[in-house]
């Protein structure tokens, strides 16, 4: 289910509360009908991409595995419960393992180009994603002054 909040409450705290609470988008009044239609189309495209079994794959990075067909994440074999945005961040990182993403790039890729959210929201989501991954949290590196990327997977020496 895609959740879009349409509200007259436009304070940053209200927006972050709504998005952190699981909303996929937050639109404040006043807004244009064309803007709302465009935002709905974006959410429908994302939903189609996520729900299409032809696009399903298993992504692995070190001890973390993502099954995109069943929307399931495991770290060291244990199931990890993620919010939609945390999941989308992790998938983006794993699909582009050596790329450094700025906060702005992550906002555009995960929340959408028309999203008006403070860039620190990304930091909060990265922090909670790291906590949920537990011992695997070190796979997401902070690149000071730039953004975030996946850490190199340690190579296991052949016996």
Predicted feature locations:
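Basic, amphipathic DNA-recognition helix from helix-turn-helix-like DNA-binding domains
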Residues: 2-60, 159
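Heptad-repeat coiled-coil signal-transmission/dimerization helices
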Residues: 33-36, 40, 69-70, 122, ...
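Positively charged, aromatic-enriched patches within helix-turn-helix-type DNA-binding elements
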Residues: 23, 72, 77-146
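Residue-level preference for alpha-helix termini and adjacent loops
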Residues: 12-15, 58, 63, 100, ...
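Short, Lys/Arg-enriched segments at the junction into DNA-binding effector domains
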Residues: 42-100, 104, 153, 158
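His-Asp phosphorelay/catalytic-motif detector in bacterial-type signaling
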Residues: 1-2, 116
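Conserved active-site beta-strand element of glycosyltransferases/polysaccharide synthases
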Residues: 149-151
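A generic "binding-loop/recognition-motif" signal
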Residues: 9, 65, 146
């Amino acid at each position: 289910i895609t959740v879009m909040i349409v509200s007259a409450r436009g304070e940053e705290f209200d927006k972050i509360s709504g998005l952190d609470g699981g909303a996929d988008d937050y639109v404040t009044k006043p807004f244009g009908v064309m803007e709302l239609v465009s935002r709905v189309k974006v959410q429908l495209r994302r939903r189609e991409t996520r729900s299409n079994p032809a696009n399903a794959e298993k992504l692995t990075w070190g001890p973390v595995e993502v099954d995109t067909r069943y929307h399931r994440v495991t770290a060291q074999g244990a199931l990890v419960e993620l919010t939609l945005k945390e999941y989308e961040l992790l998938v983006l990182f794993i699909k582009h393992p050596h790329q450094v993403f700025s906060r702005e790039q992550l906002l555009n890729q995960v929340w959408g180009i028309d999203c008006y959210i403070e860039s620190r929201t990304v930091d909060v989501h990265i922090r909670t994603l790291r906590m949920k991954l537990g011992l695997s949290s070190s796979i997401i590196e902070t690149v000071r002054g730039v953004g975030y990327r996946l850490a190199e997977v340690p190579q296991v020496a052949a016996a």
